[in-house]
């Protein structure tokens, strides 16, 4: 899986075959990475030395050019982030690297023991020092500062300590030139694979609870905890990738493979935890309303990048800029239309709608307007009392800036930017007016958009 966070890697993959790459490309990337390392803050001598070793291997083993090119691409995109001092960027840099390793070698064990593994290990050292400790603490504290949760708070201190101790221990052990069996036993005792699972499991529980909540504040908390969960899973994988390389260095192949397998299983578990986000059922529409539109939220955009890495299927087909027919699921012969009523313009369900008649336009912030295209220009807006009024204003305001929440059965639910938890539905009356209902209105509020 190639993430949009890896712009260099996109370019490299387009010009590199599965086994071989252009020497001019790899030389260009070597120069860029070397320059970035020299300009970066902190001590990067080990990384520069490992880079020289990689240069030598490329010269003597042409078949490694393609793999080296891909890894240099992922490292190049990560370097600025790892040295940024910003926790979110640092974790994004970790994601670049672990994704590059997974894509190129299938995991750290696939790199073998050589210049590429030494180079990657030296780059990971930029993270597995104080950056790991500070990044974990920063993202946990950021999430908990927004949402009070005593149970999560109790486990947070232990999680921060586990990450800090493990990363510091790995960093020290990497300085050993020859690892003995005794050293490997000490590593196993001090960095157990399961050590980070408790807090991550607590977050999984909160995400599960928040998925079906009817509280808007709880739904917002769940989405923030989803981002924290993704960040911690990636940082855990980064530490364990470094640990697997360390075991390979000590010729403990079976242990390195076991660590890598644990990472693989946890990646699958993360995909299972997050899968519902792109396969929502109506009872999960509220968390979907916080998550969508994805382009309107930095949190949602970050989560989407992580879901791609974990292998979660893509979001269902997005709504575009064109006319659509909105057909009700409960009354499946009725679609949205408009009428004039006592000087007001109302939207209702009509049985004679044959062609797409609602123009949907995406706004710059990711939300949409819904405009009747059959008569004079009318925007659907949610009135304070829930009615679906038509307004002649060019900009209907956040009452008429809509979000579309895709459901797993192909239908959509619709709510406004101002009231994300009030969903558009067709009422049970002779007129079939379009109104809004708090939380899931049932099939009367599920729409086929064609």
UniProtKB/Swiss-Prot annotation:
Q: Is the Transcription regulation keyword given for this protein? A: no
Note in the entry: CrTX-A and CrTX-B are encoded by the same gene. However, they differ by their molecular masses (43 and 46 kDa, respectively). In addition, CrTX-A is primarily localized in nematocysts, whereas CrTX-B is only detected in the tentacle without nematocyst.
Regarding tissue, the record states: It is suggested that CrTX-B is synthesized in the tentacle, is modified (become CrTX-A) and then migrates to the nematocyst.
Instruction: Tell me the protein's name.
Output: Toxin CrTX-A
Instruction: Answer whether the UniProt record assigns the keyword Cytoplasm to this protein.
Output: no
**Keywords of the record:** Cytolysis, Disulfide bond, Hemolysis, Ion transport, Membrane, Nematocyst, Secreted, Signal, Target cell membrane, Target membrane, Toxin, Transmembrane, Transport
Q: Name one GO biological process term.
A: monoatomic ion transport
The signal peptide annotation in the UniProt record is 1-18
Which molecular function term from Gene Ontology is one that the record holds?
toxin activity
Gene Ontology annotations for the cellular component aspect, listed alphabetically: extracellular region; membrane; nematocyst; other organism cell membrane
